[in-house]
């Protein structure tokens, strides 16, 4: 929370910070808040401050001679056709498209209060909305009710540009966003609304229906209503209210999103855990709607209205887990996938058109609060009450990494699409160290100036540093650093997260972590294990590499290592089992890798690149390029004539560490007919002794000694299960050649519970017992109504457990016979998901550290939006801050001094 204190964290606010691309600076002239700013006022009980932005088309692109507002349907048939084209043959789009094409809305809204027939009925409807919401006092009349020109447009109206909308308490403000180049006119908001009876909780602009005069704005309220405000020429704006009588849902609206490229469809989430699909052209039912099942899936049900006439809501999504308050949902960049996070701690990923559940992920503990997609749609990042940032792969259907840096709940996660790059790093190691940052500040500003690309300003920079958007005069990221002058280029994702601890964290996540089979840094015969990025002098002399936290340096990269080290699932899938040559290279050379904020390593194998986990059979050859061996317990099973590849050995004994598996010492003699290092198990006795010593040396290795890390050492299995796992792993050596999954290292507490084993190799083998047997749901686990052949299957999710556990298929089949809608509830049992790809243990997947972690506000942060020239953050006290990117701070001299508070007041205890 915002009042959480940590003696190791400085309490002063940062007005600038340095990253690899340069210095980000706070612009006080581009700060947004209430026009009549007063002193600090607590907003703890009010809804979270949200920020929405939209870019309007220029007046030359729009048609200003029309009298029709954006929210008014222009040609019902066209609207219906557009909706159907956007969503394909979506069940959610088909009835809506038909209604949009055939229904004439003359009595729209709830109770017939709204009409598109004439202006008077619009005014009457607006009065009803104001009565329902306690007045809804608006400045729209003042801003748009002045003198009009020959086109009927107000002369004082701002056309085109960007709009920013934010809520604070019971107020809703809309400003013209001027970016980092111009200051804010706080006294001239485009629109201001004050609601007496309820508080706005979320909002969203419709980009597809935007005109130079504005864009339709959806506003959700704490009492459950949804308001649509459409720009309209004249003194009155068009307003419509959905769920007016609260007959559909009485709980708070937690998230609102327009469907991608749809002018009329939007999705609303409520605190009740339900999702509703609306068409803004259709009225709501005058009575409480009744539903009938439309589609049943594993853990979810989709209902549709029984009404003979098409009315809102069109569909209702119900999830069958307890405490399933939907906190946020997000559509993929392509618009075909939907990611939903809820208070029960689950991430659910759907194919929206077919309403199929593609995959799930479980939080380490607590609920998930926020979600976002990577710009290329390959990864989903979620944040929640476990203080972690979790990265989930769409192609592999598993958690591929976690990030630890926040000390409280993560409020917002967002990708920065403007700093994703292919590059190498030739500068120093900033690693959030301000003493080293100043040394590069002036030189980096010159390198990363706004016109550096156009003027050839990268002469001193690495020739291999080529941004993805070469024609963009923006900042560049250098995430894959190498003091060994590695020529290999990797894609780096820049991720930002803000939290209730008032800090912002920036992460550089490279594909060598997300896709590459992790490779050991130390030699095969070494007895040392690096814990938390520690530096070993002798290892440095042997490898010529120094480990620096939070950034690991890469080693010497040869042509063979580039070939064997780069993850190429497509090549492996095409080659089948003819990868012995590559396997020998991978097994003989422990190629090094570097990430911007992760200190991890393990032994690679060509089998590690051979997974097509969770990709459909029809797309496995293409989607295989994004799939690698899981960091969880994934088995090698044949399903739909696909070979799911094996995992590698990733060990994290204490937060962040680098160890090796005993398969290295075994050479390649694990079977003449199999690939070398086909089976990887736990620690050998040498590394086990080393890790045990390090565990006794204290718990201060982690830079972030939070409750999350402390709880990570606790096992979630019963003592009998631990004992069974220990004896099975110690004495059942016959299964070793059949285990092609990643060997998993349990926490030190579990090593103690496996007691009686004085031989470290036995205890470590027990800790990495048969996690290779996958358990998938039976193909008949889903309900019979409307469910397709893939809606049920968690085989693609590969929710595997150790062999001493009952499979999820058995549990689902046993519990699913009682009720069709709850057939997959057992699949969402948190205890059964722990240790699976959906929820790997804390020491079973790569753990990232932030590139930058700075305290930037007095109150908890609630919003983060990246723009091309800046990024914006919002905090609960109603301030929206603009941070200029390197080379874009034109009025940087106006920023606050370090001793001056950025916002009035202080941290509330």
From Swiss-Prot:
It holds the Pfam family WD40. GO terms for cellular component: peptidase complex. Disruption phenotype: Viable but sterile with reduced lifespan. Severe defects in adult intestinal epithelium; increased number of intestinal stem and progenitor cells in the adult midgut. Keywords: Repeat, WD repeat. Residues 58-132, 458-483, 554-628, 661-699, 720-739, 749-775 are annotated as: Disordered. Residues 80-107, 115-127, 612-628, 673-699 have a biased composition (Low complexity). GO terms for biological process: negative regulation of ubiquitin-dependent protein catabolic process; positive regulation of canonical Wnt signaling pathway. Residues 555-569, 595-606 have a biased composition (Polar residues). The keyword Phosphoprotein does not apply. WD repeats lie at residues 248-288, 321-362, 363-402, 470-517, 856-893. Gene3D superfamilies: YVTN repeat-like/Quinoprotein amine dehydrogenase. Disulfide bonds: none annotated. One of its GO terms (molecular function) is deubiquitinase activator activity. Regulatory component of the Usp12-46 deubiquitylase complex. This complex deubiquitylates the wg/wingless-signaling receptor arr/arrow, which stabilizes the receptor and increases its concentration at the cell surface; this enhances the sensitivity of cells to wg/wingless-signal stimulation. This increases the amplitude and spatial range of the signaling response to the wg/wingless morphogen gradient, facilitating the precise concentration-dependent regulation of its target genes. Component of the Usp12-46 deubiquitylase complex consisting of Usp12-46, Wdr20 and Uaf1; regulatory subunit that, together with Uaf1, stabilizes Usp12-46. The Usp12-46 deubiquitylase complex associates with arr/arrow; the interaction leads to deubiquitination and stabilization of arr/arrow. This is WD repeat-containing protein 20 homolog. It comes from Drosophila melanogaster. The gene is Wdr20.
């Amino acid at each position: 929370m915002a009042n959480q204190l940590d003696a190791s964290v400085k309490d002063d606010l940062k007005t600038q910070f340095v990253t690899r691309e340069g210095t980000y600076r706070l612009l006080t002239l581009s700060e947004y808040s209430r026009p009549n700013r007063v002193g600090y006022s607590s907003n703890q009980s009010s809804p979270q401050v949200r920020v929405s932005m939209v870019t309007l088309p220029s007046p030359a692109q729009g048609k200003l001679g029309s009298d029709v507002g954006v929210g008014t349907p222009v040609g019902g048939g066209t609207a219906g056709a557009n909706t159907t084209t956007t969503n394909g043959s979506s069940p959610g789009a088909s009835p809506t498209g038909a209604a949009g094409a055939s229904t004439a809305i003359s009595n729209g809204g709830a109770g017939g209060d709204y009409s598109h027939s004439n202006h008077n009925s619009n005014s009457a409807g607006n009065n009803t909305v104001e009565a329902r919401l306690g007045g809804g006092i608006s400045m729209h009349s003042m801003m748009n009710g002045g003198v009009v020109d020959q086109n009927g447009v107000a002369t004082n109206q701002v056309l085109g540009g960007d709009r920013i909308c934010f809520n604070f308490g019971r107020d809703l403000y809309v400003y013209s966003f001027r970016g980092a180049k111009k200051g804010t006119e706080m006294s001239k908001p485009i629109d201001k609304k004050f609601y007496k009876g309820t508080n706005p909780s979320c909002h969203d602009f419709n980009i597809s229906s935007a005109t130079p005069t504005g864009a339709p704005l959806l506003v959700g309220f704490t009492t459950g209503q949804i308001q649509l405000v459409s720009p309209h020429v004249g003194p009155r704006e068009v307003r419509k209210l959905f769920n007016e009588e609260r007959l559909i849902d009485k709980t708070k609206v937690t998230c609102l999103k327009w469907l991608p490229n749809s002018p009329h469809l939007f999705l609303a989430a409520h605190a009740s855990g339900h999702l509703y699909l609306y068409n803004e052209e259709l009225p709501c039912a005058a009575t409480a709607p009744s539903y009938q099942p439309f589609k049943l899936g594993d853990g979810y049900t989709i209902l549709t209205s029984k009404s003979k006439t098409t009315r809102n809501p069109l569909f209702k999504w119900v999830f069958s887990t307890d405490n399933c308050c939907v906190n946020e949902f997000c559509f993929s960049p392509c618009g075909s996938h939907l990611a939903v996070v809820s208070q029960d701690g689950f991430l659910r990923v759907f194919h929206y058109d077919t309403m199929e559940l593609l995959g799930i992920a479980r939080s380490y503990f607590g609920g998930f609060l926020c979600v976002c997609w990577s710009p290329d749609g390959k990864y989903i990042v979620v944040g929640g009450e476990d203080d972690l940032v979790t990265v989930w792969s769409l192609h592999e259907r598993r958690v591929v990494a976690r990030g630890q840096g926040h000390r409280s709940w993560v409020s917002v996660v967002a990708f920065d699409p403007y700093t994703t790059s292919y590059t190498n790093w030739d500068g120093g190691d900033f690693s959030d160290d301000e003493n080293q940052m100043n040394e590069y500040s002036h030189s980096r500003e010159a390198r990363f100036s706004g016109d550096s690309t156009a003027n050839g300003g990268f002469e001193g920079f690495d020739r291999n540093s080529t941004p993805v958007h070469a024609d963009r005069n923006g900042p560049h990221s250098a995430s894959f650093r190498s003091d060994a002058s590695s020529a290999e280029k990797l894609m780096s994702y820049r991720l930002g997260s803000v939290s209730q601890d008032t800090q912002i964290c920036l992460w550089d996540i490279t594909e060598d972590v997300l896709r590459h089979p992790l490779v050991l840094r130390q030699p095969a015969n070494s007895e040392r294990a690096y814990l938390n990025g520690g530096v070993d002098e002798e290892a440095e002399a042997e490898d010529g590499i120094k480990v620096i936290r939070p950034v690991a340096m890469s080693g010497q990269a040869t042509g063979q290592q580039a070939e064997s080290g780069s993850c190429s699932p497509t090549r492996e899938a095409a080659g089948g089992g003819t990868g012995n040559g590559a396997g020998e290279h991978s097994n003989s050379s422990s190629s090094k890798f570097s990430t911007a904020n992760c200190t991890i390593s393990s032994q690679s194998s060509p089998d590690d690149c051979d997974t097509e986990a969770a990709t459909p059979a029809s797309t496995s050859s293409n989607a295989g390029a994004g799939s690698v061996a899981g960091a969880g317990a994934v088995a090698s099973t044949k399903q739909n004539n696909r070979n799911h590849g094996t995992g590698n050995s990733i060990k994290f004994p204490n937060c962040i560490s680098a160890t090796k598996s005993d398969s290295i010492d075994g050479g390649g003699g694990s079977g003449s007919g199999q690939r070398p290092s086909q089976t990887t198990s736990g620690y050998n006795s040498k590394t086990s002794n080393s890790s045990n010593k390090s565990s006794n040396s204290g718990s201060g290795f982690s830079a972030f000694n939070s409750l999350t890390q402390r709880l990570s050492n606790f096992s979630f299995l019963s003592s009998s299960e631990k004992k069974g796992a220990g004896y099975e792993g110690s004495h059942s050596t016959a299964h070793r050649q059949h285990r092609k999954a990643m060997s998993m290292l349990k926490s030190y507490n579990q090593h103690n519970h496996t007691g009686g084993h004085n031989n470290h190799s036995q205890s470590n083998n027990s800790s990495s017992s048969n996690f290779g047997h996958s358990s998938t749901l039976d193909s008949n686990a889903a309900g019979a109504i409307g469910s397709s052949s893939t809606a049920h299957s968690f085989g693609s999710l590969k929710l595997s457990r150790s062999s001493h556990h009952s499979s999820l298929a058995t549990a689902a089949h046993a519990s699913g016979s009682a009720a069709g809608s709850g057939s997959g509830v057992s699949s969402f049992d948190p205890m059964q998901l722990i240790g699976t790809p959906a929820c790997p243990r804390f020491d079973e997947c790569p753990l990232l550290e932030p590139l930058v972690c700075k305290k930037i506000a007095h109150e908890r942060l609630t919003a983060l939006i990246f723009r091309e020239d800046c990024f914006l953050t919002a905090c609960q006290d109603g301030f929206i801050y603009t941070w200029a990117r390197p080379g874009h701070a034109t009025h940087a001299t106006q920023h606050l001094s370090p001793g001056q508070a950025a916002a009035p007041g202080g941290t509330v205890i």
